[in-house]
Amino acid sequence: MSIFLDQIEKRKLLEEASLAETFEKGTRRMGIGSSKRHAVPPSDHGAMRSVLDALGVTGYELTDSEMTTPEEQLNAILRPKGILTRKVSLKDNWWKQSIGPMLGYDREGNLTALLPTRWGFGYTFTDKDGETRPVNRKAMASSLSRHAITFCKPLPHKTLSQGDLLKFAFKSMSMTNLALLLATALVLALFGMFTPMANKMIFDIVIPTGEARDLLPIFGLLAGAGIGTMLFSLTRNLCTERIRRVVEMHLQNAVMARTFFLSPKFFTKNSSGELTARLDNVSKICSLLNDTIVGAFLTLLFSVVYVAQIFTYAQSVTLPSLAIIAVEIIALVLYYRSIVRARSEYTEKYNKLSGMEYGMFAGIQKLKLTGSERRALTLWLDKYTQATHRIYNPTLDRRLIPALLQLCNVGGTAVIFYFILANGVTTSDYIAFSSAYGMITAAITTIIAVIPEMAQIKPMLDSLNPILEETPEMEQNAPMVDELFGSIEMTEVSFRYSDDSPLVLDNISLSIAPGEYVGIVGKSGCGKSTLMRLLLGFEQPLKGSIYYDNYDLSKVDKTSLRRKIGCCLQNGSLFTGDLFHNITITAPWSTHDDAWEALRMADMEKDVRRMPMGLHTVVVEGSSGFSGGQKQRLLIARALIGHPQIIFFDEATSALDNISQKQVSDNLDSLNCTRIVIAHRLSTIRHCDRIIVLDKGHIAEEGNFDQLMEKKGLFYEMSLRQM
């Protein structure tokens, strides 16, 4: 009965807190409260609507609440849709780049929508008088701020195929740029038709008459075609580069965002080095498409216009010519498939090799300490040889097909000569036909040259399959967690890591009140860290439910929940960078004063102030410049920077001396937040309000330190080992 009474009491506390919060909001809206925020101006709403409409967001509602800023409202609307925001500085002539809709600021700090023009060349904004104006140097100098918010469109939050990825890339293109690219490619193909025409005119008109002056108009025609070809080639290259940059930006951001939203379980199956190699392929794919393949394929595609010329000049040779071209295309397909097989094997093994290389360099000190450099190098050489075997030792078909293509060209020319002689084609028609046919064979030769690059794309896309096939952790339209009071409840939770493994946690029920200090202890393998992973949503329980206040963990937006929790897990690490960004990474809005306060709470302030660069002290790979205790205190500071209502510590003070540990514990006592601590040292949990003893996946004992010692049970036996 006590469990149900505790739950009823907890519900009453939550209802009272909710009523107090609602009353506070009401008084602030009437001007009685102390909030310094103001209602959102109508112009800000207009700017936000314009940007949201441009992003294709529907089903949202903007309010005039004084409790939220426009940026907070925007984040609340976009977060369930998976659209990420980022603050940027607008430098130089930024409006000449197509980077999608943005939310900017005017000189008075009000929001304004920065929208691309209809044709994708330039931006417009709405001034304070409601007039739409183009963005230019004058507008930037007089009306607009140099700061804005950009948006990253996400990939769909479901299992994706390579086709879905390519479809997303296609949608990110500007249709204006795409139409311009196709138009310039067509014009270039049409310019190429002038050469066969000029050859025919020379042999039909100039040579028979012997009039040299007749060459002048033909020369002018060819010169104009040459200049036009040069200019349109430049336009095509610029357009291709523009498309590549836009597609690469959207695709790279979307794939990276999807990777970060994958469940923690995904990262246990893929090493950091391997994931880096896979993600790098996104940029490589865009570069390969832009640098070689798009141009070559557009040339081949529009070479169809030369078929019409072939038919016009030598109708009797058209069918044999098309047959030869068809044979060459079939050989190209076979050549492509043979290279793809070799590249697929190489790419997959290379990704694994990258993961191994990263691990070797990360553990280079251990390799040197144990004198294992030669063994590591031998292992690397063995894996490298396996990965590159098919690249340096191509199969027979890969060596034969290029030679057969050359033979096909020579043999095809002989066949064409035979049909020309047999059908009595005139000299002028033959010369014109030869020029047109040469354009087609030149396009095929270009394709042959880029096939090795083209064959890399399919294996690179295959390497992204683990990321595409994994479903992101984010649930569409899941409720956001705006505030926590600190209540946690687990009801009959069971969990196992695989279907054929035993239960790690078996029917665990646990209720933690707001502000309670709870310690969790037990022998190694009893399920302490697993319990923490379940509470953080890193794993899904086999059965049972977990609630934070009134939020069901299985249905809530887990990222917004974790932002309200300060967490310091076992074997945590610092990032490469400086101390300030390491501490504030979980709360990027924090100031230097906030960072110093977090360091003080973690008993690390004095140490950092003694460092010459203070908060700007550089953290190198592996955090080799810091002791184990300093590293743990920095991680504790990171957990405290956001002023969380719930704190999780998993062996977070194991490297601290007793004095530092007591100082940290005393500082945490002043926060009046819910604390859950996993520890082995009795000094860490001695002052807990409640200690939970786990054994073989069950709660074996429960009570405060003195009560458990009096029971002389499992906790008492564990404590004797430390006395």
What function would you assign to each model-found segment?
Residues M1-T195, P208, A212-P217, R236, ...:
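Membrane-integrated ABC transporters
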Residues K349, L353, Q365-S372, L396, ...:
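Cytosolic ends of transmembrane helices, especially the final helix of ABC transmembrane type-1 domains
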Residues L468-G519, D552, D593, E597, ...:
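Primarily ABC-family ATPase nucleotide-binding module
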Residues T530-R533, R563-N571, L579-N582, W589, ...:
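ABC-family ATPase nucleotide-binding domain "signature/switch" substructure
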Residues N253, A257-E274, E345-N393, P479:
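Loop segments that connect adjacent transmembrane helices in multi-pass transporters
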